[in-house]
Swiss-Prot record:
The protein, known as: DNA-directed RNA polymerase II subunit RPB1
UniProt keywords, alphabetically: Acetylation, Chromosome, Cytoplasm, DNA-binding, DNA-directed RNA polymerase, Host-virus interaction, Hydrolase, Isopeptide bond, Magnesium, Metal-binding, Methylation, Nucleotidyltransferase, Nucleus, Phosphoprotein, Repeat, RNA-directed RNA polymerase, Transcription, Transferase, Ubl conjugation, Zinc
Residues annotated with Phosphothreonine modification: T1840, T1854, T1863, T1870, T1877, T1885, T1894, T1912, T1915, T1919, T1926, T1929, T1933
Residues with the N-acetylmethionine modification: M1
Name of the gene encoding the protein in the UniProt record: POLR2A
Modified residues (N6,N6,N6-trimethyllysine): K1866, K1873
Organism from which the protein derives: Bos taurus (Bovine)
Chain positions recorded as RNA binding sites: R67, R460, D499
PTM-bearing positions, type Asymmetric dimethylarginine: R1810
Domain remarks in the Swiss-Prot or TrEMBL record: The C-terminal domain (CTD) serves as a platform for assembly of factors that regulate transcription initiation, elongation, termination and mRNA processing. The trigger loop allows entry of NTPs into the active site, switching between an open and closed state with each NTP addition cycle.
Family note: Belongs to the RNA polymerase beta' chain family.
Cross-link position per record: Glycyl lysine isopeptide (Lys-Gly) (interchain with G-Cter in ubiquitin): K1268
Residues bearing the modification Symmetric dimethylarginine: R1810
Region (Bridging helix): 832-873
Omega-N-methylated arginine found at: R1603
Amino acid sequence: MHGGGPPSGDSACPLRTIKRVQFGVLSPDELKRMSVTEGGIKYPETTEGGRPKLGGLMDPRQGVIERTGRCQTCAGNMTECPGHFGHIELAKPVFHVGFLVKTMKVLRCVCFFCSKLLVDSNNPKIKDILAKSKGQPKKRLTHVYDLCKGKNICEGGEEMDNKFGVEQPEGDEDLTKEKGHGGCGRYQPRIRRSGLELYAEWKHVNEDSQEKKILLSPERVHEIFKRISDEECFVLGMEPRYARPEWMIVTVLPVPPLSVRPAVVMQGSARNQDDLTHKLADIVKINNQLRRNEQNGAAAHVIAEDVKLLQFHVATMVDNELPGLPRAMQKSGRPLKSLKQRLKGKEGRVRGNLMGKRVDFSARTVITPDPNLSIDQVGVPRSIAANMTFAEIVTPFNIDRLQELVRRGNSQYPGAKYIIRDNGDRIDLRFHPKPSDLHLQTGYKVERHMCDGDIVIFNRQPTLHKMSMMGHRVRILPWSTFRLNLSVTTPYNADFDGDEMNLHLPQSLETRAEIQELAMVPRMIVTPQSNRPVMGIVQDTLTAVRKFTKRDVFLERGEVMNLLMFLSTWDGKVPQPAILKPRPLWTGKQIFSLIIPGHINCIRTHSTHPDDEDSGPYKHISPGDTKVVVENGELIMGILCKKSLGTSAGSLVHISYLEMGHDITRLFYSNIQTVINNWLLIEGHTIGIGDSIADSKTYQDIQNTIKKAKQDVIEVIEKAHNNELEPTPGNTLRQTFENQVNRILNDARDKTGSSAQKSLSEYNNFKSMVVSGAKGSKINISQVIAVVGQQNVEGKRIPFGFKHRTLPHFIKDDYGPESRGFVENSYLAGLTPTEFFFHAMGGREGLIDTAVKTAETGYIQRRLIKSMESVMVKYDATVRNSINQVVQLRYGEDGLAGESVEFQNLATLKPSNKAFEKKFRFDYTNERALRRTLQEDLVKDVLSNAHIQNELEREFERMREDREVLRVIFPTGDSKVVLPCNLLRMIWNAQKIFHINPRLPSDLHPIKVVEGVKELSKKLVIVNGDDPLSRQAQENATLLFNIHLRSTLCSRRMAEEFRLSGEAFDWLLGEIESKFNQAIAHPGEMVGALAAQSLGEPATQMTLNTFHYAGVSAKNVTLGVPRLKELINISKKPKTPSLTVFLLGQSARDAERAKDILCRLEHTTLRKVTANTAIYYDPNPQSTVVAEDQEWVNVYYEMPDFDVARISPWLLRVELDRKHMTDRKLTMEQIAEKINAGFGDDLNCIFNDDNAEKLVLRIRIMNSDENKMQEEEEVVDKMDDDVFLRCIESNMLTDMTLQGIEQISKVYMHLPQTDNKKKIIITEDGEFKALQEWILETDGVSLMRVLSEKDVDPVRTTSNDIVEIFTVLGIEAVRKALERELYHVISFDGSYVNYRHLALLCDTMTCRGHLMAITRHGVNRQDTGPLMKCSFEETVDVLMEAAAHGESDPMKGVSENIMLGQLAPAGTGCFDLLLDAEKCKYGMEIPTNIPGLGAAGPTGMFFGSAPSPMGGISPAMTPWNQGATPAYGAWSPSVGSGMTPGAAGFSPSAASDASGFSPGYSPAWSPTPGSPGSPGPSSPYIPSPGGAMSPSYSPTSPAYEPRSPGGYTPQSPSYSPTSPSYSPTSPSYSPTSPNYSPTSPSYSPTSPSYSPTSPSYSPTSPSYSPTSPSYSPTSPSYSPTSPSYSPTSPSYSPTSPSYSPTSPSYSPTSPSYSPTSPSYSPTSPSYSPTSPSYSPTSPSYSPTSPNYSPTSPNYTPTSPSYSPTSPSYSPTSPNYTPTSPNYSPTSPSYSPTSPSYSPTSPSYSPSSPRYTPQSPTYTPSSPSYSPSSPSYSPTSPKYTPTSPSYSPSSPEYTPTSPKYSPTSPKYSPTSPKYSPTSPTYSPTTPKYSPTSPTYSPTSPVYTPTSPKYSPTSPTYSPTSPKYSPTSPTYSPTSPKGSTYSPTSPGYSPTSPTYSLTSPAISPDDSDDEN
């Protein structure tokens, strides 16, 4: 926990963290000891004579009262004193209302008289309970309570023969008797509660008849509890040390400190006391009264009254909402706020003040859009920026800048508000008279204003998912609103109609680093929720992109130039125009191709793509240009729209993110917007009323369609009137009618809509918005132009509101379209008043629905989060919760993160056996085919070698097994799966990078493929470990991916389809491995919260009310939010429980048999088949009253099989409905049998034949024989009979089951429409075939009985009632069912949520072995700590419970730590740093006293390395411009390689251009004399020949300032996708230009040094270094082992097999293939812009800085002797030998990125005080630098750049000369004697001191880029015989064999000056000396 307390007293070291919180009940003694008011508080008054009264309620000992006062106890003032407790001694004990229930429970468990436990603690059951409930005291009490419930006698000693329910073995018998329980053997009373009083009542009155019911006084209870022993306390679930039972009764009342109940002072009036003080006053008053009464011996009833009142007051102080009690009021009648109300609820203490607080350093204002900002920027108003501060610590590197800010003070922006001295003093600059007098020292803190480039968190409520809070970089802009890029509105769900957003400025560098690395917008582009981007191109840009990429868009030269101006990554080359004559024209697609980054490949379709185009002979040609193909970063064809640029999975943005990384994708967004929007300015887009008018023919069509629809409706109405309408099965007549009408009207709307759309021209602006996907849909168009359509309320047509009509304007019972809400006008035509009213009704419903839904889903989301908040991926990769229970063994069952997977198809699943064999089996018999696909020698090998053939057969076998496995996993044949590494796209990339010609045979040996894949799948490890379980787990986790891998990379497809070369295949395998490893979920990831958000967010989009979808006999199912609620609440009674019954065998196919089963299941009562019933008085059956029955009745009575005499004269006649009978397959006989079975002989039931015209049952009561005896009472009996018959009638109709299962009220039978319910079988040929089988769906569930029915498929039959599945099938089944149900709810409205989130929720709910509801009944019954529970719901109850049981909270979860202000164990907080204390000793002091160390520029303000105010649009716009030199611009190489570590930025032709930037760095583009490669003001690196490939230009170089908006200037010419090769004939490129020195290798893009691996240097380029014969990429002799391979790449290993510079053999993302360092991967720790030594915010990174410490990633212990303080370590020191083992060029610490190896400053020594990387004087491109300025050398006034003698390239010039100083007369380049071997040279010469002021690396003399290397320098001539790189004897400084030894300080094998590309070194030479 970082320092608490006020900021001034910040403790530097972290305070101790709280490990555990113990709860308990305070004992009276402890309360008294804790209290500061001796003798208790006796007076209800607060003051006496205006002074606080001692012993009163505002006792001065309890805390500070006045602002100015001090506390009498601790002498602290208002802010320091925390307040102190007092106490009141109560005259009589009272119950504590919070513990009342607990008190009763304990009372019921112990003997009323002797306080012994009612069950002996030796009872085995008790032992069992104790064992089971370890650590769960509450459970223990519950179990013991259940045991004691039945006991009503306290078991005594002797009677105790064996009262246990447990039989004891003989031996124990006497032992028990002897010891006994020692109870008193008396009867126990029942304990009852009424209000706040307890009563004891005895059921069994003992011999000495006691009174039945007594009032239990708290004293009595206190006595009983006191006598309970500690052991028994423990058995009762108490913790005797922290919570004894008698403490639950209040004897001493604590008085809360004053700070808890402050008084409010009103102006001029008396103090208003807090509610608690009022309450305490009441208690004190009544307590004093009670004590007085007791002393005076008042009557018992008076005292009882007083006690009752005291009890009431104490209770209402704790809880003022007690049921059955009056509220305690203030005089005004407002109920008092009790302690409980203070804590609970959203506004309460816990949720309102502890879990969520208001914070400082936040800002809020309205948002407005700004397309010119990058997506990760936010425009902040200057007024806000000047008010919010960031505390920056003063270091030697920022002291000048901060001093300047302090000088400006708070009044001007940018300035500072406070200085905090190192002793903690705060100086407020607002009130300081002369801020300029204040001097800073290192270690002070300056609270400076927010400025450009600061990192902030931006947030919009409601914060539904993590993309609602993202990190942005600040850009200060004028005016008062936040500005943000349009693309970011999607994740924030923001619009600009007045939304406000919040901004938080983080206050520590750690926080900033975390936000920058984890939460910046570009890193959030892809969401793990549904593995797709959440940001796309929106609105005008989207509309424009569609227009821009159409086939007919051509741009003139001027327009193209203008657009390229806005492309920040442009490299200065305009592509070849598509059309040359009559004048050059460029297409829109061409320009868009320049925006697309890197080598992206992508195939999508346009929104208007017709489906039938995908097959057939012309599938590759798209007539409407609707198929989008992006290949190698070029848009080949297709119109872009929302599908390719929106937020869908697989869009261009998504691929860019996955392939090129987040940084490049950020630029992609920005570039699309700037370029396209600027084109739209020229092109224009508007919409007017004219766009909504169609032609007259269309209107005619619309009229006709509506007329016909109305006609149809009238016909349907007539049919219904005439009873000709057949109800569809399962629907009533009315429903059927409504459905038909609805269908007719909806069809009419759709038809008119489509005709309206067809009539619109291609140029219609409505249409262009809809087609591009920017706004609106087809329905909107049709509503505007054609028909608004049917208005619905609750899913039905407008209901009748008045009597039988909707509005008084219509006639009654009008079912026509108009009267029931069909709007036949369009919006354009306008609505009639009635239409308008109906439309308003429909609209209003939508609004209400939304409002209600928001509250519902908000609560659901909160519950989800609370239930899973602490579920995280731990370091062993399991997913566990805060109490370390395993929830999942691997996250998502595959251990991968949601962001990095994508949809892929499993190739082997679908095809038939034949197709499968043809595609996957390597056919080595077909020689002709082999020769077409493989090279000759391979063909021979394959044909001749049986071993190879066996291997290939085995491979095919393996794939066949895979296919079988897949067909078990995906029985439906759905081959779309979510996997990492899109293999097909990676293969495509490989083909492009390696220029694979798919028509040439491949040199890839099939066996190499098989082996390679085998090896690879061994490397893809999700579960480490070698035991059988781990191996099994590993197989499960990677099964699908391995199958996918084997089927995609099988030898046959490699040879035939992909034709990869061997080298390409190796690249591919490495790439897959690295991508797979990057996809693994990070330990520390809070996947619980992630899952909760991912489910809660789509829930917000769901519909609330389930509209019953009008369909044919479909049953209604609950969907949407109500269903989600049912599922996570695990409701016992779902609204629509239902079974889906699948059938077996014949029944499934035969409708009749299926019908049989339907009848067997559907519950049928007599009522369902009855037409009518009647009761007749029919005394004489022979002549029955009902004439039509006479005939068949006679048949019965002729030969009666019953006693006719006993028959009752009353007759119940039931007429059955024949249709229903046949429908239900019932016979009369069955019914009669059922009746007889039910009533036996008491009823007589006769029935007619099944074929009779009417089916009739006649039922009579049979009177019992006794009735016959009592003739005289007959009349009464007759009366009774008919009443009795009535009862029987109703009973029979409703309760008598004829057939079926009671719970199943209705069964529907249908053929499935969707595939997932069809039966999928696999035919003989191995194809999937979906069969339609009858399935039954039921209303009501009874799974157990249905599964046991005959012909029901027990495997597939399923229920949607979760609880039922749990009871029938158990926990595993219910987990799967829950997952399926959730998936169904979410996917119903087309959302998709990645499986891992659903799975995690299901696992959370079921991992305990029972169903845990996501409600307080589930979540709060877990074993998590009380603090977590109380932050969810039932706050006070949870805390009381915890106190009573003495629980403790282990502080392992998230909520607990947040409450206590500690760092939660989440994300970066879940592990500790391991610091090697020994290594810290070798740190290095920075000399802080040397003047000039702080970099003061011309104005004294230096913004170079600090967040600079340079503009994002153009540096020229800002007043402070020194930092904004072009060198610092976006095209400084840093961005180039920043986009992809060391690879070509966007240049398609330079597939593996190691420089990372195209050769666009020509001096022509350098507006200042410096070279464009010259370092930025804060960069200590000088570009040098190897610079192109040197990792020093990685984004981690301080020159790359990710926070400098200047970093993205639109003129930045760094990438040119179309530059095929930079033609040296370009006019701006003249070799005579003084800046252009062909001999300065780092200085000419045509010089080979620009990336030897770059294929873009075509050998045809004339200036392609003809002097270096070995240097031609096509020359076979150029191999990586050739010594001329740049030694500047220190860790490059020439043995890397696949490295051949002629082939772009490495990919930016694959660590194994970066030529600059095999170990260099974007995930490697050194590749991180925030890595501590590289943090762009820490300008101090230089070897002189204390930060340059062994923990820096550059420094590794492999060079133990390197200590920055060691004076001998300096390249100039004689004992520095490159041959020394510690300095192997591969040593990671020896990397060109380290400033100490700036080879161009050979003598640079770390101890040189003057060397500061950000010294602005060191920028050749700095505006103030002019080569002609004679005085420009900060250290030597005599130095003149015009002197020819300063050319470091002069062969004679040796920087190692000790005398070398610009003033030394001895030095003359023409003096032939001058050579390092000259005797004057001795490193010990005193003059040679690296600190010598004349010898400062900052001196411009040392820039090889200095324009003075002029080719005219006579000594440096390429024609000089010495100067031939091929001359074997050539040595850079002197003839071979001279003492130029490796110990010479100037020589460094890694010095880029000696790189192969430097024409000044001989290949052999560099090799020998290496």
